[in-house]
């Protein structure tokens, strides 16, 4: 199966080249693969940096939104444009380690009942305030969704393209992929992964900003959980 790596980025001109090269190195054992970076309306030199990488990295496909639409839309744009049956996503700031991709792919391929494999960050390199906010947010989320998510904020995930496109789309949906995939009747597995300091630049998110949107999103996902019966086998008679 072809593997498509999808990386949404916003104002990451200093990070994209190094990250793209690391991803290409991690995929050397994959005979059929492609790398898609989705520039979500950057206002720095991200678009130019991505265009330059087309000459350097085989199977590299940069895409660009004409305005900022958010991380979930960036992922969805990449998945819809992808030709691979298996999708890998990771954040564009370099904190996810591409060297962990093969382990997640191996786990997904080992069990046909799995729809998604998520990384679980070990020894996180975030600030203390972000770690505390994440811990509290995860507890509240688990109380609401009961999805057993081991690390909701890890951007490194592997899943089937068709499974993703079956999910209801909404802004910030990338934070709830585990619950949404389970809602469709798939199993989810977890793999410990490395976590690194940001390569360059600053985060686009704040703890308060995440909290404000999370309450509404959690209520929406809980509503969705109660109104779906999961996968079914369809037979033509």
Give the role of each language-model region.
Residues 169, 179-196:
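Catalytic donor-sugar/metal-binding loop of nucleotide-sugar-dependent glycosyltransferases
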Residues 33-36, 47-81:
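Conserved donor nucleotide-binding strand/loop of the catalytic core
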Residues 14-18, 44-53:
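Acidic helix N-cap motif at the loop->helix transition within catalytic regions
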């Amino acid at each position: 199966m072809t593997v498509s790596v999808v990386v949404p980025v916003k104002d990451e001109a200093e990070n994209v080249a190094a990250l793209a090269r690391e991803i290409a190195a991690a995929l050397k054992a994959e005979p059929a693969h492609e790398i898609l970076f989705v520039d979500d309306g950057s206002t720095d030199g991200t678009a130019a940096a991505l265009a330059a990488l087309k000459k350097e990295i085989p199977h590299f496909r940069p895409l660009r939104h004409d305005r900022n639409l958010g991380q979930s839309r960036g992922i969805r744009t990449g998945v819809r444009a992808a030709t691979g049956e298996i999708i890998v996503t990771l954040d564009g700031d370099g904190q996810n380690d591409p060297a962990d991709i093969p382990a997640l792919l191996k786990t997904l391929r080992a069990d046909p009942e799995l729809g998604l494999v998520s990384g679980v960050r070990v020894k996180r390199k975030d600030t203390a305030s972000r770690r505390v906010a994440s811990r509290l947010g995860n507890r509240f989320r688990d109380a609401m969704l009961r999805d057993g998510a081991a690390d909701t904020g890890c951007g490194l995930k592997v899943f089937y393209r068709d499974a993703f496109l079956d999910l209801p789309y909404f802004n910030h949906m990338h934070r709830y992929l585990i619950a949404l995939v389970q809602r469709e009747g798939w199993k989810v597995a977890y793999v410990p992964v490395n976590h690194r300091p940001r390569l360059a630049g600053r985060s686009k998110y704040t703890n308060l900003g995440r909290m404000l949107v999370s309450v509404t999103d959690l209520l929406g996902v809980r509503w969705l959980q109660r109104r779906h019966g999961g996968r079914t086998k369809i037979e033509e008679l």
